[in-house]
A protein has these predicted regions:
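Transmembrane beta-barrel wall of Gram-negative outer-membrane proteins
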Residues: 231-259, 263, 275-323, 351-353, ...
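Outer membrane beta-barrel strand-and-loop segments of large Gram-negative receptors
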Residues: 408-412, 551-553, 557, 563, ...
């Protein structure tokens, strides 16, 4: 009994001298303020004793601290007035007040800016916006200025397809974006003119920067979603992580099933020297089924404070199937030429293995070295069956099979040297090798069978250098990238060399940023290339119906773009304007094989050039519980398409689209939201986009101390259809489609201590993207 009493007394004495101090730091709207600095000082001499930072929930703790009566706290965070706290109480809540100040790249006045300019790029401050509690990265990317798309495939208005990066690592699995919680995101960058460290084929980048994580031990995430439109779709994900100071491991599995029912109506108009033809196609309730399974795992090792290496292995299997009937009427002038009915069934699948390894090291205080290596192998098969009959067409069945095998190997080395506090030099090299084999066979029970086999080999070697300097308020980046690209295509059936070419070119880059008082100006100039996809370069033809065939073009040339972009921002109002000149523009052309009866062959070709002017205005504001973001995009395309008789077939009217998103912060973590989007009737390149209006709404809520997140959403309430027209010489294609995107969905996510720290990035980013 006596030893027990002595122990209790010693514990009591110890606790009175070294008591625990804990509390919570709150920011605007009483939201928890993560990563605030909390320092403990002694009284009365103000000697620094110890310090820490708050976690994601705004909580801090000093396990062993001096007596609270003889100390005080100093709490600080960017954008807030520093608070001095005395006396100190345990489990104390400290609320910081927003500051008002101006810096060259940040302006804070009462409330934070969601969108900030950095040169001509946009940096979205997700962690201090309502988007931080919206679900996953895939749920918020399309809500950023100039961005559209879904499910890992995004476009930057006027720039084209965007490559998504998480830190310095390119995302090759789109489903990964549906596994990154928005609460783990610090910022998202919309890079409209990427620098030379990115592939010359990368026209735009969306870069997700995650928060710094400090947690250890076992963590995990379980996410479930289910939606109902005409048909049901669901998604299930599990990810586990285990972290120590030296090792971070992770493993994940996802299963995605998408089922859609799509309505589409097409009308094609073709002018020939003797007749005007029209083909009307009605394709109601085409069923589509997509099944994707992904397993991934990896490890990162912190060898010491200056050296880190890791590896990741991913396996994917996807099965896609769609089928339906097409009722077609062929008109010659005002008369019905033929009625044709066809039933199409398509089944495709692929298996893919991808491995990545990386090394990151620091040499002294000035050098940083990065190495990344990739290997990918994919085997795919696409089978189609088309049963066709008509008033002039005997019943027949066309069976086609496309088989492809991709092998990609790539390496990337980057080095960064800090010349001084105002200047940095980056150099690097990137090499890749791609081998692609495509085998096609077609069987028509009323005609001869067809077959083709193509083997392509591509080699790319690139070196790049970029310098960054700060001269007073002016910041400038200047660099260039030099690429040598060799392509060789061989017809295996006919033992014929189709293509054996080499391309070499410099791709310069210049970017400048200058703040003047509350206004920030940016200017950038870059040159990019868009190489044809492997599918566009195929030498096979696919049967569509009696009157139409599709083909590839192994002789297709790369497309080059020169882009000059200007931007300016005043507080929360941002404006940008860009001019583009595109050489050897790639577009689908429709060629008349036979005039009577009509037969059309569609294939990608190069047009000499076109130019475009793109504008964007973005603004965000918070009024009480209401926070809204609005975005306006306008495009004027200088691209004329003429018929053989000299008449202009497309128009010149600019195209515009606008979004207005509202979020309402209610008590107890309830957040209803309303998303509005509309577009005008206008022309983009060879397309005319018809007017549309979309409305979606929903509500989000956190439960169980923020570990459980739920979102109920209703999408495309009006059931708006997509309507567009594509123009070519003596040809016009009108499409109206309803994609079964009017639905209601429920999303649930449970997270505990889940922090993935993999730093590798893809060396084969361009090659994977072209697949």
């Amino acid at each position: 009994m006596k030893p027990l009493l002595l122990t209790l007394v010693s514990i009591f004495i110890s606790s009175s001298v070294h008591a625990q101090i804990a509390g919570t730091v709150l920011g605007e709207k009483s939201h928890p303020l993560g990563y605030a600095n909390v320092a403990l000082y002694s009284l009365p001499d103000s000697v620094f004793l110890t310090g820490t930072i708050t976690n994601e929930l705004g909580k801090y703790v000093f396990a062993k601290a001096a007596n609270a009566s003889s100390t005080y706290l100093k709490v600080s965070a960017i954008g807030y007035v520093t608070a001095i706290v005395h006396p100190i109480m345990n489990e104390q809540t400290i609320k910081l007040k927003p500051n008002e100040y101006s810096l060259s790249e940040v302006v804070v006045s009462g409330q934070r800016e969601l969108f900030k300019s950095r040169g001509t790029d946009i940096v979205a401050d997700i962690q201090h916006s309502n988007l931080r509690d919206f679900g996953f990265a895939d749920d918020i990317i399309d809500k950023l200025p100039m961005v559209s798309g879904e499910h890992g495939s995004y476009n930057i208005f006027g720039k084209g397809s965007a490559v998504v990066y998480i830190g310095n690592r390119k995302v090759s699995d789109p489903s990964e974006l549906s596994r990154i919680s928005t609460k783990d995101i610090a910022t998202i960058e919309v890079i409209s003119n990427p620098g030379v460290k990115y592939d010359a084929d990368t026209h735009a980048v969306i870069k997700i920067n995650l928060k710094k994580q400090h947690t250890k031990g076992l963590g995990g995430t379980v996410a479930l979603s289910d939606g109902q439109g005409r048909r049901n779709y669901d998604n299930e994900q599990v990810q586990l992580t285990y972290n120590t100071d030296k090792v971070n491991t992770f493993v994940g599995f996802s299963n995605s099933t998408s089922r859609y029912s799509t309505d589409q109506e097409n009308t094609e108009y073709v002018l020939t020297p003797s007749s005007a033809w029209g083909l009307y196609s009605n394709m109601p309730k085409w069923y589509s089924n997509y099944y994707n399974k992904t397993v991934t795992g990896g490890v990162s090792l912190n060898l010491d404070k200056n050296n880190t290496l890791g590896g990741q292995l991913t396996y994917q299997r996807e099965n896609d199937r769609y089928n339906g009937e097409s009722n077609n009427v062929m008109m010659q002038g005002e008369n019905v030429y033929e009625r044709v009915n066809s039933t199409l069934d398509s089944h495709s699948h692929y298996n893919q293995w991808q491995a990545n390894m990386y090394y990151e090291g620091h040499i002294g205080t000035k050098w940083t070295i990065n190495f990344n290596g990739d290997y990918l192998r994919r085997k795919s098969t696409d089978d189609k069956s088309n049963e066709e009959s008509g008033t002039l067409t005997n019943p027949h069945t066309v069976l086609t099979t496309n088989k492809a095998t991709y092998n990609i190997a790539a390496g990337l080395v980057e080095a960064e040297y800090q010349l001084n506090k105002n200047a940095t030099l980056k150099v690097g090299t990137n090499v890749s090798y791609v081998k692609d084999t495509k085998v096609y066979s077609g069987l028509d029970d009323t005609a001869e069978s067809t077959a083709s086999s193509l083997t392509s080999k591509e080699t790319k070697m690139a070196v790049f250098a970029e310098g960054e300097a700060n001269m007073g308020k002016l910041s400038a980046n200047i660099g260039t990238r030099y690429e040598i690209f060799k392509m060789s295509y061989y017809d295996d059936l006919n033992n014929l060399q189709l293509v054996d070419k080499s391309y070499s070119r410099f791709y310069p880059y210049v970017s400048m940023s200058l703040p003047v008082s509350d206004v920030r100006f940016g200017l950038s100039l870059t040159t990019k290339v868009q190489r044809p996809s492997y599918y566009q370069l195929r030498n096979s033809q696919e049967y569509f119906n009696r009157y139409e065939m599709e083909a590839g073009n192994p002789l297709l040339l790369p497309q080059y773009t020169t882009d000059l972009t200007y931007s300016t921002q005043y507080k929360s109002l941002r404006f940008s304007l860009s001019y583009q000149w595109i050489k050897d523009y790639i577009m689908t052309s429709n060629m008349i094989d036979a005039e009577n009866p009509l037969h059309i062959l569609s294939k990608p070709t190069n047009k000499s050039h076109y130019s475009a002017l793109n504008g964007n205005v973005a603004y965000n504001k918070t009024i009480g519980i209401w926070e809204f973001y609005t975005n306006l995009n306008v495009m004027r395309t200088f691209f004329s398409i003429y018929n053989t008789d000299g008449t202009l077939t497309n128009g010149k009217r600019p195209y515009a689209e606008m979004s207005f998103n509202s979020y309402f912060n209610l008590k107890n973590d309830w957040m209803p939201y309303l998303l509005l989007k509309c577009n005008s009737d206008g022309y983009m390149r060879e397309y005319r986009i018809k007017q549309g209006f979309f409305i979606s709404c929903g509500i989000t809520k956190h439960f169980l101390k923020n570990t459980l997140y739920a979102r109920l959403s209703v999408n495309n309430i009006l059931g708006t259809k997509e309507r567009e027209t594509r123009f070519d010489t003596d040809y016009k294609f009108e499409k109206e489609r309803f994609r079964d995107n009017r639905n209601i969905s429920l999303f649930l996510r449970y997270t505990f201590n889940n922090k993935k720290k993999y730093k590798g990035k893809n060396a084969a980013s361009e090659e994977i993207g072209r697949m």
